[in-house]
């Protein structure tokens, strides 16, 4: 096989369909847009959600709920993720970000009890679930709310 003999795989390259190039091309005259009407015009077509004048679904349904501007969103860390640290290490939000476990601190970090902790750690975070707190102290570690 030589470079000039290389051919693309069968069916991997499709020729662009050129419309409006004479009736014998199969896509001449109306260029696949049908006859007259809004959709046949340049820039024609209806906006998203338009239902032909009928009240659209998003207006028929009632508004629901609200966004609490005081809501706090915590960065979640599970116990099994803390096993990357050495025994006796101090785990703080800064250390978690440097280790790549948490992307951003948000309103603080919350430690949850999923997984199993195998190391003795001193963990400093904004919040702890009961199960996480119990698991850390059971391994001889300590918990500090910051």
Swiss-Prot record:
Binds to the 23S rRNA. Residues 1-51 are annotated as: Disordered. The gene is rplO. SUPFAM superfamilies: Ribosomal proteins L15p and L18e. NCBIfam families: rplO_bact (TIGR01071). Belongs to the universal ribosomal protein uL15 family. This is Large ribosomal subunit protein uL15. GO terms for cellular component: cytosolic large ribosomal subunit. Gene3D superfamilies: 3.100.10.10. Residues 1-13 have a biased composition (Basic and acidic residues). It comes from the Bacteria. Part of the 50S ribosomal subunit. InterPro entries: Ribosomal_uL15, Ribosomal_uL15/eL18, Ribosomal_uL15/eL18_sf, Ribosomal_uL15_bac-type, Ribosomal_uL15_CS. Keywords: Ribonucleoprotein, Ribosomal protein, RNA-binding, rRNA-binding. Pfam families: Ribosomal_L27A. GO terms for molecular function: rRNA binding; structural constituent of ribosome. It comes from Streptococcus pneumoniae serotype 2 (strain D39 / NCTC 7466). Residues 23-35, 42-51 have a biased composition (Gly residues). The keyword DNA-binding does not apply. GO terms for biological process: translation.
